Each structure stands twice: as C-alpha cells, then as structure tokens.
Amino acid sequence: MDTIVFGTPQKPTASITPFRSLVRITSPAVEPVSLAFAKQHCRVDTDADDLYIQSLISVARQYVEDVLDITICSTVWEVKYDLFPVWAIVLPRLPMLDRAVTVTYRSGDGTYSQLSNATDFQVDASVLPGRIYPQWARSWPATRGDENSVTVRYSAGYGDDGQSAPPIVKHLILLLVAHWFDTRQPAVTGAPQSVPQTFDTLLAAASMGVYR
C-alpha cells in the first residue's frame, strides 16, 4: 500500500522494531480452516484421519503465520525489548487488534513500572503494522537498558475465528495440509517432493513486503 504525500505516492518505510523475544501468550480458540473444509480439499471421505488432518491444520496455520509474520486468529502476544526506541514501537505479527495494550518497563534502579494508555502512550491499530508511541509532548521513560527492560503485551489477528483473514492466506493453509497429508516423508525415494510452485506463488502474493 502506498502513502500519498503531496499527491505523490510514497512507498511505506515502516519496519518492525527489533525485539529481544516474542512469546505467544494465548493460542487461537479455533482454527481459520475447518476440518470439514480441509477434508474436502484433500478429498478425504472417511473419519479415520480426522485427528491427523486437524493437527496438520494447526501446524500449517503456524507455519504461514511465521513466514508472513502475521496472526490469523486473535492471539495475545508479549514482546520484549532492551530499551525504548526514539519514537514508535512498530509491533510484529500484524494485524494489531484495537484491544488492551500494556507496557511495562524496568527503570534505572531496577524497579518495574507500568505505563498508562490514557496518559503515557497512544495506540494505532489502524495501520499495518500496528504501533504504539508516546502521547503528545511526552517521550518514553528512561530504562535500565539491559536485556528485556521493556515488555509490551497486545492482541493481533483477523478476529477470533480468523474468518476475515484474506482468502489467499487460508488457501495457503489448505495447500500445505494437502501436501503434507499426501507426502508424509521429507522426500520420496527417486522423486524428491517439495511444496508445489502454486504455494510459493501465493506466499509471495500474500507477503507484506517491506513490513517483514
């Protein structure tokens, strides 16, 4: 998506703020692709492999999320930094949801404090990727500056069931499930197998480009 500045399209320049660690606090309540839909895609009519296919859906969803740096179904993430940036903290695992955000930091004396969304920082979940930044005429507080001095907890995803996720993303999951269901070894003797080119093409189309 281009940004219009004085009538001239400008390529977006935002990039994810480098972080120390990223942890998934909550797991999705449901998968964005149903078992029935996956079985239909794989052309499976029996129930014997239901548990296996369900596990493939979960693994495929995680793989697509990791590669594209996105969150499909609503998830709470916790990301840690060694210190605050100069201005905005651009958060990973887009799209950010307009839900509660907590920011905790360790000051120079080693004590922990929590910032207030009302007075200390603003949240912008309307852009990709989402970000937080200080309130008007304020700045981030000084931190101790050692590892994991800043912790941000926030929510991301395309809704609780992921149904509003781009269709191309859900189709990527289906392609992986079908491929893994049919090919259960890393390679087939005499005929090495890889994910079909169709998957790579869709993956490139779904990529967020400069945001990764």
Go through each PLM region and give its residues:
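Divalent metal-cofactor coordination and adjacent catalytic microenvironments
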Residues: 1-212
